[in-house]
């Protein structure tokens, strides 16, 4: 197993303390602390005695006097703001509103400092690991991790060998998923080093909350999140070849049917770069060009939101209609930078995840600042046998799974389901890991006309510009809305919360940035609404100018329909917003 202890539940003393002494609160918090189904979890607003924790005192003071009608009014205001801004995510080709809860998650400055340190450490170590794996492979020669761990990884692409980023950065953006266990300790649940989704909802959640609850922000020192796009643009521009003083950067999207298309469009607009599809680009002489209404334009950096397998039909899926033929050869020649780098999946494979603490110690000579969740490696005989013996009490996860799909919760599974998953583990040990049931921490969440505990996780986003790793203060808090559920994924009924990182009192810059963010979020005067809308439309029209059709062979209607159907299917196969 990847760590020593399997105990993720609190001690009997801690549990009995919470059950024995529970301060009663009235109004919308009535009965909150007596909900036994969540008694084993660490609640982030209330301690075991029902006292409000320090970071949440202002939130509690603001919300506690509210009655059911006021709660509903606040929730309706949030919903209308989201609809007005067109904030949705696509699931199975259908646009849906992204649920935002009205109670923010609050993280103290001291707690965030510890998390930020651990995230930076992890990203730096994984950066060194990827450079080594696609280079000298010293970690394999030294026997620190098994060679077969890499050769058996579906996302280890030999095609990526020889592609050396100009500034040495392969992980331009990372999403490190964290959970808080029953002891209140943050642990890493998963690394996302390819195309982590969700940052657009972080920014839009903040914008919406600031519009609806400006008074709350006025009484808290909440660090801003709106400058994410400027950090990302700096990282992408820094990634270009050193001889490019003004590099051309584009965002490559699978298309409008992808679940994260809203995010692709938002980031491109905020960075002031073109949003393109594969059909807008072509390669000639190992150089990538963009078709525009003004002619061809060379592209220097591509922030791609397309999976490796669809990126280049010359090297991966030959039937891909989303990618650009020859783009890998152009990257190998040093004429374009692909962000994040091809082959990064060998760094966020769920089995590789169990070795990350070892990777950190090997490359940095440091102990991990953030621990993993305890994990069994089913490909090791002794650990696999223990998993099979205890399968009714563990969580079994597919190594290649995403979106919460394929996970089996042993305590909730039927005998038939347990027999089926046992058979799968035996037949493909490399394809599975197992973990104890982690009682994710809880935060008050609106459920009908009351606030009730619901489990949450956290996805902070880190941006590496080659000089430093910057971590967005907070990140995407996802919440499991169905009662008792531990599955937070939006594709399975999850919602989200605005995540507040409180600035230290000494940080004047953070306070000023946060204040400016709130001011920008406030609704403009009515007389300006028409011109504002016109400006948005103009911006979108300018962005679409890059999508000139360019020369092509005529197709009959049947061929066109077939091509469109394939394009839609492949767009939906890409990574979902989770």
Model-derived segments and their meaning:
Residues 1-578:
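Preference for protein termini
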């Amino acid at each position: 197993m990847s760590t020593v202890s399997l105990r993720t539940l609190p001690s009997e003393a801690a549990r009995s303390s919470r059950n024995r002494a529970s301060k009663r609160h009235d109004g919308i918090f009535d009965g909150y602390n007596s909900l036994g189904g969540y008694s084993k979890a660490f609640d982030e607003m209330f301690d075991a005695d029902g006292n409000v924790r320090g970071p949440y005192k202002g939130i509690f003071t603001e919300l506690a006097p509210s009655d059911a009608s006021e709660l509903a009014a606040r929730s309706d205001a949030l919903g209308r703001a989201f609809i007005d801004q067109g904030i949705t995510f696509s699931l199975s080709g259908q646009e849906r509103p992204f649920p935002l809860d009205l109670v923010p998650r609050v993280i103290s400055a001291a707690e965030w400092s510890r998390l930020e340190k651990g995230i930076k450490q992890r990203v730096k170590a994984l950066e060194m690991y990827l450079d080594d794996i696609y280079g000298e492979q010293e970690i394999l020669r030294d026997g620190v991790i098994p060679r077969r761990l890499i050769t058996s990884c579906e996302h280890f692409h030999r095609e990526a060998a020889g592609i050396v980023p100009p500034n040495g950065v392969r992980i331009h953006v990372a999403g490190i998923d964290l959970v808080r266990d029953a002891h209140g300790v943050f642990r890493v649940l998963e690394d996302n080093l390819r195309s982590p989704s969700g940052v657009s909802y972080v920014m839009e959640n903040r914008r919406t909350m600031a519009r609806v609850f400006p008074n709350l922000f006025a009484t808290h020192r909440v660090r801003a999140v709106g400058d994410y796009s400027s950090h990302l643009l700096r990282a992408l521009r820094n990634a270009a070849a050193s001889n490019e003083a003004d590099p051309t950067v584009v965002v490559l999207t699978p298309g409008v049917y992808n679940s994260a298309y809203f995010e692709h469009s938002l980031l491109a607009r905020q960075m002031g770069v073109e949003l393109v599809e594969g059909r807008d680009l072509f390669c000639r002489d190992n150089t990538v060009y963009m078709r525009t209404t003004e002619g061809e334009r060379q592209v220097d950096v591509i922030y791609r939101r397309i999976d490796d397998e669809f990126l280049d039909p010359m090297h991966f899926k030959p039937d891909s209609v989303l990618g650009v033929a020859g783009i890998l050869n152009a990257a190998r020649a040093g004429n374009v930078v692909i962000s994040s780098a091809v082959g990064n999946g060998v760094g966020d494979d769920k089995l590789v995840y169990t070795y990350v603490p070892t990777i950190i110690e090997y490359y940095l000579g440091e102990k991990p600042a953030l621990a993993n969740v305890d994990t069994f490696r089913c490909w090791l005989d002794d650990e696999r046998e223990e998993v099979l013996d205890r399968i009714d009490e563990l969580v079994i996860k597919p190594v290649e799974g995403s979106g919460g799909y394929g996970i089996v919760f042993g305590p909730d599974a039927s005998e038939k389901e347990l027999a089926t998953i046992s058979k799968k583990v035996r037949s493909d040990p490399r394809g599975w890991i197992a973990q104890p049931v982690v009682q994710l921490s809880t935060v008050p969440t609106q459920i009908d006309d009351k606030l009730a505990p619901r489990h949450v996780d956290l996805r902070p986003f880190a941006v590496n510009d080659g000089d430093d790793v910057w971590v967005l203060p907070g990140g995407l808090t996802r919440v499991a809305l169905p009662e008792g559920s531990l599955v937070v994924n939006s594709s399975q009924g999850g919602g989200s919360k605005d995540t507040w990182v409180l600035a230290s009192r000494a940080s004047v810059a953070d306070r000023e940035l946060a204040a400016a963010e709130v001011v920008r979020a406030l609704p403009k005067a009515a007389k300006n609404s028409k011109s504002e809308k016109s400006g948005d439309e103009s911006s979108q029209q300018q962005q679409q100018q890059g999508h000139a059709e360019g020369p092509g062979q005529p197709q009959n209607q049947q061929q066109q329909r077939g091509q469109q159907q394939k394009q839609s299917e492949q767009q939906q196969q890409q990574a979902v917003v989770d």
